[in-house]
Swiss-Prot record:
<protein>
    <recommendedName>
        <fullName>Alginate lyase</fullName>
        <ecNumber>4.2.2.3</ecNumber>
    </recommendedName>
</protein>
<feature type="binding site">
    <location>
        <begin position="135"/>
        <end position="136"/>
    </location>
    <ligand>
        <name>substrate</name>
    </ligand>
</feature>
<keyword id="KW-0456">Lyase</keyword>
<feature type="binding site">
    <location>
        <position position="253"/>
    </location>
    <ligand>
        <name>substrate</name>
    </ligand>
</feature>
<keyword id="KW-0732">Signal</keyword>
<dbReference type="GO" id="GO:0042597">
    <property type="term" value="C:periplasmic space"/>
</dbReference>
<comment type="similarity">
    <text>Belongs to the polysaccharide lyase 5 family.</text>
</comment>
<feature type="binding site">
    <location>
        <begin position="62"/>
        <end position="63"/>
    </location>
    <ligand>
        <name>substrate</name>
    </ligand>
</feature>
<dbReference type="InterPro" id="IPR008397">
    <property type="entry name" value="Alginate_lyase_dom"/>
</dbReference>
<dbReference type="GO" id="GO:0045135">
    <property type="term" value="F:poly(beta-D-mannuronate) lyase activity"/>
</dbReference>
<dbReference type="Pfam" id="PF05426">
    <property type="entry name" value="Alginate_lyase"/>
</dbReference>
<dbReference type="GO" id="GO:0042122">
    <property type="term" value="P:alginic acid catabolic process"/>
</dbReference>
<feature type="signal peptide">
    <location>
        <begin position="1"/>
        <end position="23"/>
    </location>
</feature>
<dbReference type="InterPro" id="IPR008929">
    <property type="entry name" value="Chondroitin_lyas"/>
</dbReference>
<comment type="function">
    <text>Catalyzes the depolymerization of alginate by cleaving the beta-1,4 glycosidic bond between two adjacent sugar residues via a beta-elimination mechanism. Splits ManA-ManA and ManA-GulA bonds, but not GulA-ManA or GulA-GulA bonds. Also cleaves acetylated residues. May serve to degrade mislocalized alginate that is trapped in the periplasmic space.</text>
</comment>
<dbReference type="InterPro" id="IPR022859">
    <property type="entry name" value="Alginate_lyase"/>
</dbReference>
<keyword id="KW-0574">Periplasm</keyword>
Amino acid sequence: MHKTRLALSCLLGSLLLSGAVHAAEALVPPKGYYAPVDIRKGEAPACPVVPEPFTGELVFRSKYEGSDAARSTLNEEAEKAFRTKTAPITQIERGVSRMVMRYMEKGRAGDLECTLAWLDAWAEDGALLTTEYNHTGKSMRKWALGSLAGAYLRLKFSSSQPLAAYPEQARRIESWFAKVGDQVIKDWSDLPLKRINNHSYWAAWAVMAAGVATNRRPLFDWAVEQFHIAAGQVDSNGFLPNELKRRQRALAYHNYSLPPLMMVAAFALANGVDLRGDNDGALGRLAGNVLAGVEKPEPFAERAGDEDQDMEDLETDAKFSWLEPYCALYSCSPALRERKAEMGPFKNFRLGGDVTRIFDPAEKSPRSTVGKRD
């Protein structure tokens, strides 16, 4: 009996130690984020004025204002008002993405310093942290977090260690990312299943990027949990019921759901969590259904209860940036890889910039100019 108790005690101690070691492991991104900075001759462009940190209420008009339940009819007046009011947020999203891409490709210190100056200014002013918001406002918050933290990850983890000379700025920026991430979690937690759609998936990507950038495991865990919920929504045929509600835009919104889900899955796998088996392979099933739908949209039209599907969004190659993490997660066919190469390189500022350089660095073409497709 004594020996049995001793053995159990040793086993328990071993398990506890193992758990402690696992808990202490630093969060990491996929290996493409460790790429060194390319160094070239020349000076960086002058640093533009920092966009005014957005510290006001995140209350904006929706571009679908006045639309029916499908939320698919554009209100041009509301969209104009939305774009005007959110201009500083979009400016920093696109600007940081562009500067980080340019820095990683050319290694000019001015681009790095300008990026950090922009992010630090927003961090010091506590931008995007208001608790006064509407649905469109909290949507902008999570999109911005994903864009900024996603781009910052390339600086944080590059083997060239570009942030080593800027510890104070990095500390303030990461502290801000963590605070915004905490608020995004509050914004998008505990929703009824009928209201969980692509917005929640993008929130999961934003929180995942912030969690890895700041090494906050509660953020990582929340993002993984949102993925579990998303995977559970995918039916046996690869459809998302809440995206079918978009009627003529159902296929486009299924496609729009894939970038954040693929990124969360790729980051989870980098940290030893394989989400590809969730709900009997839901992520792969969703991707396969979307790819089939692009070629033959009739099943989407039938399930969405609309004669036609709006294919305009799907004519833009950048909408398929999710193919990069997809082909890193799955064994893509030669035909799909060739198609991906023809459509890329992919740049998506909402995913942190140059997705192709992160997931398929060997796929470089003359088309890979800085700023293209973002």
